[in-house]
């Protein structure tokens, strides 16, 4: 509930973009900036034979303040695993 449709880039929902964060498959929340969505190719950076314990996504930190949803559960597992 509350999750908008996928943008087609690795399943990133509208809430990820709106609140400037990404919830990864392991539950970690990563702060994003607008360049992350334009420059990062989720499909290219996920290898099928890579061990999931060693596979890491880039951590991008944005200095702009984030607005959080008021009283609602935001979203879950938008990053492609």
Curated annotation (Swiss-Prot):
Q: Which residues form the signal peptide?
A: none
What are the subcellular locations of this protein?
Virion tegument; Virion membrane; Host cell membrane; Host Golgi apparatus membrane
Q: Name one GO cellular component term.
A: virion membrane
UniProt lists compositionally biased (Basic residues) regions at 66-81
Give a single Pfam family match: UL11
Q: Where is this region: Disordered?
A: 47-81
General function of this protein: Plays an important role in the cytoplasmic envelopment of tegument proteins and capsids during the assembly and egress processes. Also participates in viral entry at the fusion step probably by regulating the core fusion machinery.
Annotated protein name in UniProt: Cytoplasmic envelopment protein 3
